[in-house]
Amino acid sequence: MYLHSKLQEYDGTINIAFIGCGKFISMFLSQYNQLKKIKIDTIVDLDIKRAKSNCIKSGLKKETIEQIHFSNSLNDVLDRNIDIFIEATGNPLVGTQHACKVIQSKKNIIMVNVEADVLCGKYLSDLAKENNVIYSMAYGDQPSLIVEQIEWARLNGFFVTCAGKGTKYHPIFEYSTPKNVWDNYGITPEEAKKARMNPKMFNSFVTGDKSSIEMAAVVNASGLKCPNNGLTYPAVNVYDIANKLIPKDNGGLIDCEGQVEAISSIDIKKNQIKNDLRWGIYIVIKAQNNYVKACFKEYGMVTDNSGEYSAIWRPYHYVGLELAQSIYSIALDKKSTGYTKFFNADVISVAKKDLISGEILDGEGGFASRGRLITSKDSVEGNFLPLGL
């Protein structure tokens, strides 16, 4: 109750602004009426009519919407009394430009735009330090939640063997496009339209692009390693995480101690496995001595067969519904909920079809290319094109 207690004692108002008002922000807006001492000052969006419509559909009161300043230009609002900007466009190039402007205006920023964070996060976090402002991952997105679990483990003296997320993945999904995404995602086009789900964005979840991007963000925030040959997406249920997400030398599936991996909720036959982690996150920790191993057993903790490794997981992430955690952490505690510290991982573009000279790549979730997680060293030495470009 630490932050909640500070919130009760806080006598100010936390003024925020959104850059982009899509699904993630709409989820936050649906919680807004229950949140204390946060005021939406501004919403910047190219389509103001749609942004206002999303506010209405999310349940914002008419009088609340009338008090929000709407603009289609970030430049016009940088001088307003705003404590925290939330960049949620999903466009890596535009998002990077937005972040630079916000930071140089001495404003704190939360990057829902993990695509921009993976492309330029180290530069942006360094720029934030130079300007004495906070640059933060968005709580509710899986990278921030994974980093939180990693921090818990390290603070308590555990070695983190593996960390990652669940997803619905199959090798043939790598060639999914916005045209057939809903069949692969598991909902009807009508359901997707009603929920205002962007087919290109949600296709990035199916193809593995988003998982590669999010695991790169975790690597760059935590110092964990990339897998040797990209994410492999083994189908692993939660009670087998401690058995399978340990090094191959110890009977597991991963390359080495201290890496990331994403796991699939379906097997190679596309059957959903029992006790899957499609929407969640996990870490595997390693006991450093026999006494700790004994404690794992005595207190009923899930372990591998040797008893040396244990796993904890969170079955869901609540996406924009829990973004307020980042806002309060910055406003009340002057702390991020995770940020990029390194440039150790990159997500490169891999062709999904035969490309012709001059063809424009359409980025994550598109028709032309898909993303693969590799080390930044290999990316730079190979002169590979980042997916975000």
Could you describe each region identified by the protein language model?
Residues 1-7, 184, 188-389:
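C-terminal catalytic/substrate-binding lobe primarily of soluble NAD(P)-dependent oxidoreductases
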Residues 1-58:
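N-terminal Rossmann-like dinucleotide-binding module
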Residues 46-48, 90, 114-117, 140-141, ...:
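Short, ordered loop/turn segments at secondary-structure junctions
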Residues 47-80:
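Conserved N-terminal Rossmann-fold NAD(P) cofactor-binding segment
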Residues 76-88, 92-111:
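Rossmann-fold NAD(P) dinucleotide-binding segment
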Residues 94-101, 105, 113-133, 138-141, ...:
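Rossmann-fold NAD(P)-binding glycine/threonine-rich loop
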Residues 136-206:
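Rossmann-like NAD(P)H-binding beta-loop-alpha module
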